[in-house]
């Protein structure tokens, strides 16, 4: 996909505007931004003393942890399906 074909949107995450360019639909990119914003606000409610940079890193760590758990669950499910097919 060429640079001209990519979607460009402006989103708000944790009260800051960001310009995002990507290959996904605008709807998808907005959903991602909304989820990041939601996660940052959730973490902020528990850790009000965190500065924005620390909050962003903690959000990334939590998100990757969730991603890895889902990836492991997916692999387990695929393994179960494969065993049933054999």
UniProtKB/Swiss-Prot annotation:
GO BP annotations, alphabetical order: division septum assembly; FtsZ-dependent cytokinesis; septin ring assembly
InterPro entries, per the entry: Bac_CellDiv_Activator (IPR053712), Cell_div_ZapA-like (IPR007838), Cell_div_ZapA-like_sf (IPR036192), Cell_div_ZapA_firmicutes (IPR023688)
Does the record carry Lipid metabolism as a key word? no
User: Where is this gene product found?
Assistant: Cytoplasm
Task: Give the main localization category.
Answer: cytoplasm
Gene3D superfamilies in alphabetical order: 6.10.250.790
Task: Tell me the superkingdom of the source.
Answer: Bacteria
Question: A cellular component term (GO) from this record?
Answer: cytosol
> Which SUPFAM superfamilies does UniProt cross-reference here?
Cell division protein ZapA-like
Provide this UniProt record's keywords sorted from A to Z: Cell cycle, Cell division, Cytoplasm, Septation
Write down a Pfam family by its short name: ZapA
Say which family it is in.
Answer: Belongs to the ZapA family. Type 2 subfamily.
Tell me, what does this protein do in biology?
Activator of cell division through the inhibition of FtsZ GTPase activity, therefore promoting FtsZ assembly into bundles of protofilaments necessary for the formation of the division Z ring. It is recruited early at mid-cell but it is not essential for cell division.
The entry describes its oligomerization and partners as: Homodimer. Interacts with FtsZ.
- Protein name (record): Cell division protein ZapA
Which species does the entry assign this protein to?
Oceanobacillus iheyensis (strain DSM 14371 / CIP 107618 / JCM 11309 / KCTC 3954 / HTE831)
In the UniProt record, the gene name given for this protein reads zapA
């Amino acid at each position: 996909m060429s640079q001209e074909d990519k979607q460009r949107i402006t989103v708000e995450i944790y009260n800051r505007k960001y310009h995002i360019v990507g290959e996904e639909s605008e709807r998808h990119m907005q959903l991602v931004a909304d989820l990041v914003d939601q996660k940052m606000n959730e973490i902020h409610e528990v850790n009000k003393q965190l500065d924005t940079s620390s909050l962003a890193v903690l959000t990334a760590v939590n998100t990757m942890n969730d991603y890895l758990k889902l990836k492991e669950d997916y692999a387990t499910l695929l393994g179960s399906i494969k065993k049933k097919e054999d």
